[in-house]
Amino acid sequence: MNNGVNKLSDLLVLTTEYIQASYETEAFDAHREWVCIVGNPVALHSTLVDIRNGKVVVKVTHPGWAQYLLLKKDEIVHALRRRYPSLGVTGMSTYVDSTSRTPSAKKDMQGLSVSEKQTRPVPELAEVFEQLRTLFQVKTEEPSH
């Protein structure tokens, strides 16, 4: 009878390890496949940081990308749930990583006074809006008079 208990406990341990390994594999795959899930322009400015308690935590380089991801949240959550069901993704949160400014943007702002930095537009902002415009395929033609 003792052998039966040992075998059952071994089976439970193996099953638990398999479930944990499956979850970790899907979490790793989700990180690796982030570009496929959100698309190349968005993936360049965002990183899947963690999946915790059913929430996907995403770090972005600019508040504009956080807004874009929140607009697409339902689609992203649905794609993750469909591809990786064992992760149990139900939501998403984003945060802006202020240290992730591009080297050229940092260089553009060096040597400026505080007042100049406040009045000068952030160099990355034009790039973000241009990429968003491309994503949404918005035409920026002048209205005819």
Curated annotation (Swiss-Prot):
Region annotation (Disordered) maps to 95-119
What InterPro entries does the database record attribute to this sequence? DciA-like
Name of the molecule in the record: Uncharacterized protein TP_0004
**Organism (species):** Treponema pallidum (strain Nichols)
Source organism phylogeny: Bacteria, Pseudomonadati, Spirochaetota, Spirochaetia, Spirochaetales
